[in-house]
Curated annotation (Swiss-Prot):
Lineage of source species: Bacteria, Pseudomonadati, Pseudomonadota, Betaproteobacteria, Rhodocyclales
The protein, known as: Tol-Pal system protein TolB
Keywords in alphabetical order: Cell cycle, Cell division, Periplasm, Signal
Quaternary context: The Tol-Pal system is composed of five core proteins: the inner membrane proteins TolA, TolQ and TolR, the periplasmic protein TolB and the outer membrane protein Pal. They form a network linking the inner and outer membranes and the peptidoglycan layer.
Annotated family: Belongs to the TolB family.
Signal sequence, start to end: 1-25
Species whose genome carries this gene: Azoarcus sp. (strain BH72)
Keyword Cytoplasm: no
This protein's encoding gene: tolB
Matching Gene3D superfamilies: TolB, C-terminal domain (2.120.10.30), TolB, N-terminal domain (3.40.50.10070)
Amino acid sequence: MKTFAQLRLLLAAAALALLSFSAQAQLSIEITGAGASRFPVIIPVFENEASLPRSVSDIVRADLERSGLFSLVDIGPLPLPEGQIPDLGSLRSRGADAALAASVFPQGDGRYEIRFRLFDTQKQTELGALALRMTAAQNRITAHRIADFVYEKLTGLPGYFATRIAYVVKTGPRYELQVADADGMNAQAALVSREPIISPAWSPDGGRLAYVSFEAKKPIIYVHTLATGQRQVVANFKGSNSAPAWSPDGQQLSVVLTKDGLSQLYVLNADGSGVRRLASSSGIDTEPAWSPDGQWIYFTSDRGGSPQIYRIPTAGGAAQRVTFDGTYNVTARPSADGRLLAFITRNNGRFQVAVQDLTTRQTTILTDSARDESPSFAPNGRMILYATDAGGRGVLAAVSSDGRVKQRLSVQAADVREPAWGPLQKQ
């Protein structure tokens, strides 16, 4: 767990001991806690699914089960064809509250169309239908979108399966910035270095990552276009350049610079131009994060004597303190709907993930671990990804915003840190 004193060392450009990942390995996910009541649903084998090179329904089932909100009702190897209304009463008698009927149609051009309908077995009604076209290589993203469809229809919240996560992993002297699907699969290295990589941050469109690299023997902020691999230096000033955070429109970054002395907040354009200082204080200001409406920037500061979370208008003005419970609260990250603020709090000497309801100001500690850091919300605000320690090495973990659903993501023989949850992938 990074203490605020250690952040001082970072901002003075001291090397951080980070954790990362191996190029070929995949994250494995273990569900360590589930919702109090799970929704029983049938996701059968799709009709004509054998025509696909790889299964799609298996991935849909895995997504929904991993969420901790659903229990899968097995009806055996028989499909429920999309073109027929199933015997909903019979499916209800098997204990299912909902059922997916789906069929695969080869298109003759190397593509496939998957048509599916979701039914409420209790009300005997159809909840919705959709058709998705895919190539053989798109089986995973298509499955994630089907799972998102089911998730949204049954919970009322957008799904988060068709998203990607970024994280830094370390194997021996090798650091890698990895990007993977939210289920840990399809991991690819965006950057490999023998020097630390920290603070990855997704652009709102999911096409770019901003991060800090020490490859030039000092912390420099880069913006990396994932589709092309092209990188651009956006902050390489005297001293430390750290903690990039994107504005909601993707046009600007808030960063922390020490070019004028102490670490202070600045805003600049995404190409590195138009640098302006946002705030001045006699303490350390760091870890900025934009509010979803773009009107505020949350940040960590010790200006009041202990590390606490503040916010400041993006147009400039007086800072307002946000956290008052405890003597150590850092790394604020707002949910996409602006309702919750996730952060790290120190509780009886343990560093844990907490959330504050920004309307009621009530704070809830979500985890029972001791060395949590780097919280990052899923796009729907339901889950929070974070880094922690397990068995003497770094792992990623996720917890629902109510604390009930818990997951652990790890890689064999590697350390993983610095997670960032990306936006929904475009069609």
